[in-house]
Amino acid sequence: ASAAGAVREDDDETLLNPVLNSLDNLVSGL
């Protein structure tokens, strides 16, 4: 499970989704 996936379950954190998506992309690219 990705950090972004966990945050998507919490609507109050919507603004962080783009940031966490970027982090997930960076981590998956390592």
UniProtKB/Swiss-Prot annotation:
Highest taxon of source: Eukaryota
Swiss-Prot/TrEMBL GO biological process terms: defense response
In-chain residues carrying the UniProt-annotated modification Leucine amide: L30
Keywords: Amidation, Amphibian defense peptide, Secreted
UniProt main location, coarse: secreted
Subcellular location: Secreted
Membrane-crossing segments per the record: none
GO cellular component: a single term: extracellular region
Keyword Nucleus applies: no
Tissue: Expressed by the skin dorsal glands.
Keyword Membrane: no
Annotated function: Lacks antimicrobial activity. Does not inhibit the formation of NO by neuronal nitric oxide.
Similarity remark: Belongs to the frog skin active peptide (FSAP) family. Rothein subfamily.
Name of the protein in question: Rothein 3.4
Organism: Litoria rothii
Lineage: Eukaryota, Metazoa, Chordata, Craniata, Vertebrata
